């Protein structure tokens, strides 16, 4: 048995070919939810939430059950994560109990520290910097609506420094999608993430565009994406997270500038009337409910794929 441990801490942890394999498997599992049962036994997956969650918790718990396994769910208050022992040591210990660890946490370095000691896959269920499982679901949704991903134009509008913008850049260009990030002054993506995304884009032929003009950013776009203007933990950061963002709201007028067949995505929860209007969120071009469902299928596919890397079995 091979013992390769593959983690999914950020979107570019998957090569373009590996990402395509996961998305293909996600489509298969959506049609046949119980076709893969690698956790039969049941075997366990540790699921740790240091940040509150609705979609992530429901989709991972149900997905693990459909894969034949048992989710051991804990929150940050009921563990000693990073307090009584190093995160590396925690990774070593948890590897003796479970087959994978799914962790929704704060700083990315916490995930990297645990992964450095773990002998089982560590999955980023959301960090301050990245939200890679969500972007797998977004890409699955785009495949369903658009077919091929390569060459699609995706425009994200909002806080360019949030985890969705970062993951859309990394995951999008990995799939060959041309990604535009439109954000107000002072809210651009972190430079080191842009550098990593441009490096991956150079491999796939995709492009990355950063702009402060939402009107030109959406012209001809195949997909518009937004997220809340105030992410968890930013409620009291002292920044004006309303006024500068108003021009970046996805409304019917802005959507009309995109391609006639453009789709609209939002990872949810949505602040209706802020980053997106009711008319767009509930309108015919919105695919947010399919996108939310696809969290289940994409995450199941990811777990199946990661577990197979350890055993050498092909899902």
From Swiss-Prot:
Pathway: Amino-acid biosynthesis; L-arginine biosynthesis; L-arginine from L-ornithine and carbamoyl phosphate: step 1/3. GO terms for biological process: arginine biosynthetic process via ornithine; citrulline biosynthetic process; L-arginine biosynthetic process. PROSITE patterns: CARBAMOYLTRANSFERASE. It holds the Pfam family OTCace. The keyword Cytoplasm applies. Keywords: Amino-acid biosynthesis, Arginine biosynthesis, Cytoplasm, Transferase. Carbamoyl phosphate binds at residues 53-56, 80, 104, 131-134, 267-268, 295. GO terms for molecular function: amino acid binding; ornithine carbamoyltransferase activity. L-ornithine binds at residues 163, 227, 231-232. InterPro entries: Asp/Orn_carbamoyltranf_P-bd (IPR006132), Asp/Orn_carbamoylTrfase (IPR006130), Asp/Orn_carbamoylTrfase_sf (IPR036901), Asp_carbamoyltransf_Asp/Orn-bd (IPR006131), Orn/put_carbamltrans (IPR002292), OTCase_ArgI (IPR024904). It comes from the Bacteria. It is found in: Cytoplasm. Belongs to the aspartate/ornithine carbamoyltransferase superfamily. OTCase family. Reversibly catalyzes the transfer of the carbamoyl group from carbamoyl phosphate (CP) to the N(epsilon) atom of ornithine (ORN) to produce L-citrulline. This is Ornithine carbamoyltransferase. The gene is argF.
């Amino acid at each position: 048995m091979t013992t390769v441990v593959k983690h999914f801490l950020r979107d570019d942890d998957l090569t373009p070919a590996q990402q395509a394999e996961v998305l293909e498997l996600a489509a298969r599992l959506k049609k046949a939810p119980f076709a893969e049962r690698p956790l039969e036994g049941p075997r366990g997956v540790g699921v740790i939430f240091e940040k509150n969650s609705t979609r992530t918790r429901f989709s991972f718990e149900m997905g693990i059950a459909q894969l034949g396994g048992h989710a051991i769910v804990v929150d940050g208050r009921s563990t000693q994560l990073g307090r009584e022992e190093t995160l590396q040591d925690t990774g070593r210990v948890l590897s003796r109990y479970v087959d994978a660890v799914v962790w929704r946490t704060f700083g990315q370095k916490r995930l990297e520290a645990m992964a450095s000691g773990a002998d089982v896959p560590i999955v980023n269920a959301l960090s301050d910097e990245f939200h890679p499982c969500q972007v797998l679901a977004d890409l699955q949704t785009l495949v369903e609506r658009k077919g091929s991903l390569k060459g699609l134009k995706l425009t994200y509008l909002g806080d360019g420094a949030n985890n969705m913008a970062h993951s859309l850049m990394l995951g999008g260009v990995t799939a060959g999608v041309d990604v535009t990030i439109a954000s107000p002054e002072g809210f651009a993506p972190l430079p080191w993430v842009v550098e990593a995304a441009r490096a991956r884009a150079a491999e796939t032929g995709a492009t990355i565009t950063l702009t402060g003009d939402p009107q030109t950013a959406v012209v001809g776009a195949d997909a518009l994406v937004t997220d809340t203007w105030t992410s968890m933990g930013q409620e009291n950061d002292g920044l004006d997270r309303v006024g500068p963002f108003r021009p970046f709201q996805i409304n019917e007028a802005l959507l009309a500038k995109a391609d006639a067949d453009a789709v609209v995505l939002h990872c949810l929860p949505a602040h209706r009337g802020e980053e997106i209007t009711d008319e767009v969120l509930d309108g015919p071009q919105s695919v947010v409910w399919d996108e939310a469902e696809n969290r289940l299928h994409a995450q199941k596919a990811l777990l199946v794929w990661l577990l197979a890397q350890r055993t050498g079995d092909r899902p």
